[in-house]
């Protein structure tokens, strides 16, 4: 029979282990994020902190960031993008670490003139270097209703999903000499800003400021992630996303999205890589 002291000791060990590996579930713009720029152009629109808007005019855009940093996690939010003529605007949802050799995982939505589709720009940076761009046109109008955009980031891969459909997988290819973002904690950021010099048709379409202010909406922000605190990450291998891989169905969905809706893939850009595609593309 195990003694009372033995049971207490075992319970204490389990408790300390669980505390070390505690995950965060965030879901309120009031308590989990800070509108860190925009001079009033970013607004939380309800009392519970479920709905937030970002606006852009000729003088400034706006943005918010999470209070906490994370090293691995599943981060998702629902977004409804700027309607009508959104040329020159960029609406974002991304993870990023500080410093000059930062890591970053991007969802960027490049606006367009009325009647033409948004371009979804995805990228992965490691130690300040990106060049991993894949771009898509969406199979729906992202300005009519909210859709769920999600980043799954674990030690082996980054998966981008839309409404639960995986559209891109960036695998850890360190064995091939390809850096992977796994050492630097990142915050969640979102922003609406102007980039008319490149965002729409390479800068050919300029922002029509008579349509300002431009406004995008965010809601149902959720994080299941490993919090970085005091130089350590409370990362648990018990989360399904921590070991998540794409099964046969998931891989087929990625192929479907890329076959039907991808408009740019760095892996097939022979002008940029005349000596052959980067090793992670094989």
UniProtKB/Swiss-Prot annotation:
Residues 27-218 form the GH16 domain. Residues 1-26 form the signal peptide. The record marks 106 as: Important for catalytic activity. The active site is at 104 (nucleophile), 108 (proton donor). Xyloglucan binds at residues 108, 121-123, 131-133, 197-198, 202, 272. Disulfide bonds join 226-235, 267-281. This is Xyloglucan endotransglucosylase/hydrolase protein 20. Root specific. Catalyzes xyloglucan endohydrolysis (XEH). Cleaves and religates xyloglucan polymers, an essential constituent of the primary cell wall, and thereby participates in cell wall construction of growing tissues. Involved in cell proliferation in the tissue reunion process of wounded inflorescence stems. Maybe a downstream target of NAC071 as a consequence of auxin action in wounded stems. InterPro entries: Beta-glucanase/XTH, Beta_glucanase, ConA-like_dom_sf, GH16, GH16_AS, XET_C, XTH. Pfam families: Glyco_hydro_16, XET_C. It is found in: Secreted, Cell wall; Secreted, Extracellular space, Apoplast. GO terms for cellular component: apoplast. Contains at least one intrachain disulfide bond essential for its enzymatic activity. Glycans are attached at residues 112, 238. GO terms for molecular function: hydrolase activity, hydrolyzing O-glycosyl compounds; polysaccharide binding; xyloglucan:xyloglucosyl transferase activity.
